[in-house]
Amino acid sequence: GLTFTDCHMPQTEAADGATYTHHNMTQSPLENPAALEKCLTCHKSQGVEDADAMVTFVKGKMDELAQIQQATKTKLDEFHAKLAEVVAAGNADETKLQAAKDAYNLANVYFLYQGTAMRPTDGSMATMNFSKSVEQLQKADDAIAEGMAQIA
């Protein structure tokens, strides 16, 4: 697998032919020709032909993940609102209510973990591990469904 430095700090060739480590690690790899070349060492075998196609591929995955993230976020917000409504009504079965609260907390952890707490819905984690992010979102969705069933 790749590491942060493989993508954000690739080996770059200077004008004199010397190889050095690119140190602008805050730059998006999508804006760095050396980083895109590193991507293509694997992705060419998947039909991604050049740097422009690589950027299109990555942005497509980011958009796809952002849509899944936003759908989960909407469910999580609806679950939170339903929990608040049930608590305010004051007549819920305490065991079921606690199970629902626990499910909400678990779903929220999965949701925040998959995208980092700072950027949970922008799709940027697609480049790090798309399938793991989707897996975490599915776990969040499952916990939401289980919790909502407790207070339905």
List the predicted regions and their residue ranges.
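Primarily the internal scaffold of c-type cytochrome electron-transfer domains
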Residues: 1-6, 10-151
